[in-house]
C-alpha cells in the first residue's frame, strides 16, 4: 500500500546529529509514512548510529541505501526520489530535526487546500540563539518565482516543504548532478514554476541546525565559485528554455551580483579574488540600475560598491600586466 509521505534523509559523516534527527522523524503524530536513508559513503559512525537507532522503532517503515563512494548531494537526492513510494515527499537534512506534528500539519494542509507544495516556517538554530524565520508564499505564481530567485523572503531550501511526488519526480525537476551547492534552490525555483498551488502553514515546524557551522562555511574556496557559476548557468538555461528570462532579468541580475559580492567578501585568498573578479562582468556595469530593487540595504550597497570597484581595478591591472608581458615577449 502506498504511504502518504516519504521522508528522505541523505547523510554523510553526521554522527554527532543523526540520532536526534531520526528520533524526531520516528516520533511523529502522523503514522502513514516511510523513511528512507541514504549513506553517501560516510567514513565515521553515522551508518552504525542509523542502524542502531532505527532498530528501536521496529513498527515504522525504514529502509537504508548506501553509495559505494561519495557521490554528492544531488546524486543522493535523485536516488532517494527514485526509491520513494509516497504520495508526498519531505526531505530532511541529517543534522536537522522536525517538530512532532510536522507531517500531520503539512499533510492535512496539503489535502484540504489541494496544494502541490506546502510550506512551513523554520526554527533557525544558531550557536547562541534560536530564531523563527518566516517563509513566504505570494498570491501569484509570478511573485512566488521571483521571490524564490531572489531568496529573500522565500527560503529556497527543500526541507520545510511537503511536495507532491509527481511534481518533484518530473524529469525537469531532477537534481543537476555535479551541482552540490544550491542544488535545492534550483529545484525549488523549478517547483514554484510548475506548481499549480502552494499553501503556507504559519508555524515553525523544521529545526534548521546552524550550530555546526565551521569556518569554511564563511571562507569561500574555488569550489564555491565554480558551484555558483554552475548554478547561475543552469538557472539561466531553465529560464531561457521557458521564455522567462526577460521577465525575471532584474531579479536574476541583482542576485548574481549580490552572490558575487558575498563570495568576494569571504574569499580565502587574493588569488581567488583576482581570478574571479570578472565574474558576471557583463552585468556588473548595470549594477547601479539594478540595486534600487532593494536599495534599503545600505550596508550591502556600500560593500558592493567597494568590492566592484576593487574588481574593476584588478581587471585593469591584470590587463596592464598582459600588455607589458606582450611587449617584453616581442623584444
For each feature predicted by the language model, list its residue ranges.
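Residues within HEAT/ARM-like alpha-solenoid scaffolds
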Residues: 247-255
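Catalytic core of nucleotide-sugar-dependent glycosyltransferases
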Residues: 203-211, 218-246, 258-288
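Membrane-interface aromatic/basic loop that binds lipid-linked glycans or pyrophosphate carriers
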Residues: 268-331
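Hydrophobic transmembrane alpha-helix bundles
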Residues: 77, 98, 102-106, 154-161, ...
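Nucleotide-sugar donor-binding/catalytic module of glycosyltransferases
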Residues: 1-231, 327
